[in-house]
Amino acid sequence: MNAWEVNFDGLVGLTHHYAGLSFGNEASTRHRFQVSNPRLAAKQGLLKMKKLADAGFPQAVIPPHERPFIPVLRQLGFRGSDEQVLEKVARQAPHWLSSVSSASPMWVANAATIAPSADTLDGKVHLTVANLNNKFHRSLEAPVTESLLKAIFNDEEKFSVHSALPQVALLGDEGAANHNRLGGHYGEPGMQLFVYGREEGNDTRPSRYPARQTREASEAVARLNQVNPQQVIFAQQNPDVIDQGVFHNDVIAVSNRQVLFCHQQAFARQSQLLANLRARVNGFMAIEVPATQVFVSDAVSTYLFNSQLLSRDDGSMVLVLPQECREHAGVWRYLNELLAADNPISELKVFDLRESMANGGGPACLRLRVVLTEEERRAVNPAVMMNDTLFNALNDWVDRYYRDRLTAADLADPQLLREGREALDTLTQLLDLGSVYPFQREGGGNG
């Protein structure tokens, strides 16, 4: 059956700021306390969406979350009106204010793990929301992510959206950032590669930075998504690269159809994994980047592998990269050698995503891949699909509501909270989502 990969990109939120909240993500730590530009960040993301849509790659948008997220501050014991809660937390515990104001939901590669209908036992598309248990600021995302996905994939005959796994470290799940699918045409059954960093009883794990994904979580997600057990491989990420800042697998590997583009040191027991994939995926091709050509540290600083690998109708592929790759002489030299070599990659597309990159999120972090048949695509909420009209409407919306300068101190401004809620209220109407945010259901609630 014919099917296409649709990239659902996260729209950067109004409170995009640099707080260094993500230990193990070296860009996040390095840019802590710098001044951010939320308006520019949102426009950089929108431009990537539009240019890819114009190039023939189906593209859609996932909205940001409500931030600052007052309900969690109330859970932490701060009382009063919303304005009083903001004032108290800014004075008494500003780190909590930064956490509940994080715009991290823009990295929708962590929103959920997807199983296309060709891979599932019941023939539906399955989406399991990630619990993002390893980081407090990200663990807040799951309930609203679930509401958003249910509003976008709202046909229950074709889509099953599953709640996140229980919020415990044993079941730490980071979504599609630790998941790849390999195979032939998108509509054919594929091999799902789940990548984990640790498992109970296995001492092979990183020592400097946390392994956020567990094997136990990956196995549970595969069950929830009803993936045919014959179409699943579980593999461990190399703990040494996690300790060098590879906090998700999509920082060291990316797949598309029959191709796996990865670093030579991406996986534990890599040669064994690649042999398994060759045996189980027709036409499998591994493009392994030698450590002698690109150090892991350079892969992390440029986000070479946090790229998008996209298929054209003729079978050739486009590699979508952040500008940092072009600015690194060694990485750019390797990429041009890759273009000249015998493989499906025939074009490099480079985007300026500096605002997101400074927080540790490249092109692949910003998108959730969903393989859909034509019938399934028609069942998706049409208002989220990127086209000229939506692009112009979203740019106008960003111009109207987003600030062009934000510091940690600005998060305590009650006007920022009001701006954010008004913006999201308008956005849910624009995207025909209904009331997906807690403030819409509760009327903003004082107390």
From Swiss-Prot:
Top-level taxonomy: Bacteria, Pseudomonadati, Pseudomonadota, Gammaproteobacteria, Enterobacterales
Family: Belongs to the succinylarginine dihydrolase family.
InterPro entries, sorted: AstB_sf (IPR037031), SuccinylArg_d-Hdrlase_AstB (IPR007079)
List of residues binding substrate: 19-28, 110, 137-138, 212, 250, 359
Recorded name of the encoding gene: astB
Biological process (GO), any one: arginine catabolic process to glutamate
GO MF entries: N-succinylarginine dihydrolase activity
PANTHER family xrefs: N-SUCCINYLARGININE DIHYDROLASE
Name of this protein: N-succinylarginine dihydrolase
